[in-house]
Amino acid sequence: MAISDLLNRRVRAAPDEDEEVYSDESASGSEPPSDEGSSDESGSESGRDSLNGSDNDFDSESQNSEASDSISEDEDDDGDVKSSLNNISFGALAKAQASFAPQTKRRTKNLKDNEGTTASPLDDIRAKIQEAREQKRKASLASKDSSAKSRVDKPPPRTSKHAPTVQSSKYAVSRKRTIIEPPSVPKSRDPRFDPTIVGGRGGSGSSAPSDAYAFLDDYRAAELRALKEQLAKTKDVRRREALQREIRSMTDRLRTIENHKREKEILSEHKKREKQLIREGKKATPYFLKKSDIKKQALLKKYEGMKSKDRAKALERRRKKAAAKERKEMPMERRGLGGDSDAAPSKRRRMA
């Protein structure tokens, strides 16, 4: 049987089986009368009920026979349909299914048509309320999504400025790779922070850098001698003044370097003495020298190493320096050397 014949075949619906209704009266009529002395009216009524019951039984039997015939015919048709469907390809079934419109679309269209015909102001208000709720729900979802994204993108704030910064580890792997290593460029080394000099020999407070670069002092001394010789040979006034300034600055630099060396020596000797006293048990805690004490001891050590003539010159120079400092701190009226009190105070000359 072809698929077109199967689709165009008319099928008769099977009639529903009516439930057999048996009334109490028919049931009582079928039963034999219990009271023999009943009246004639009761006998006639029972006869009518029995006739009605027999008619109902005949009708039910006829309906049952028709239903059984229709069921048998349907079973035969179903068998033929199944045998023919087994021989149909899936492509033909798909085409047949696509030719029919889905029932859901039909139902929705019918419902929309019914709603359009029975529209009322109350329905419009309900629809507007529903739309407002839907918009509010979408806005809340969008705000939640944006807040979640901002929380993900923005790292949490630090507890304090000393706390380590939080950085995400989700970084793409770099697609660049070094094929040829560039040649190593020699870097300039600072002796103050060079680990080969400072770090390897007792830390930053040690005298390792000064010992390693002690030859610079010899260079400075040689340069100072060359400048003095050049000053003796030069007759130009401007050139002589420039050489004198340079010699003065260099001597001051050398004097400062010597003072620093002297202070370091004093501090190292003091530390050794304190460690020895603690080791012997004479002291429990060390005594740390103040900067003023270190400077005083360095000055005493400097004067002890000088000759008597040089020491006198140095003391005189130091006295003049202290007097000039005190004079600057005095008020203008007391800076004179003992003249008339009515005389006008001497004004300080400005240096150009």
UniProtKB/Swiss-Prot annotation:
Predominant location category: nucleus
Location of region: Disordered: 1-209, 303-352
Biased amino acid composition, Acidic residues: 33-43
Listed Pfam families: RRP36
The entry's keywords: Coiled coil, Nucleus, Ribonucleoprotein, Ribosome biogenesis, rRNA processing
One record GO biological process: maturation of SSU-rRNA from tricistronic rRNA transcript (SSU-rRNA, 5.8S rRNA, LSU-rRNA)
Disulphide-bridged cysteine pairs: none
Protein's UniProt keywords contain Metal-binding: no
Coiled-coil intervals, chain numbering: 221-280
This protein's record includes keyword Transmembrane helix: no
Transmembrane intervals: none
Subcellular location: Nucleus, Nucleolus
GO cellular component term of the entry, any: nucleolus
Biased composition (Basic and acidic residues): 123-134, 146-156, 303-315, 323-337
Source domain of life: Eukaryota
Function: Component of the 90S pre-ribosome involved in the maturation of rRNAs. Required for early cleavages of the pre-RNAs in the 40S ribosomal subunit maturation pathway.
Family according to the record: Belongs to the RRP36 family.
Subunit (UniProt): Associates with 90S and pre-40S pre-ribosomal particles.
Protein's UniProt name: rRNA biogenesis protein rrp36
Species per Swiss-Prot/TrEMBL record: Emericella nidulans (strain FGSC A4 / ATCC 38163 / CBS 112.46 / NRRL 194 / M139) (Aspergillus nidulans)
Gene giving rise to this polypeptide: rrp36
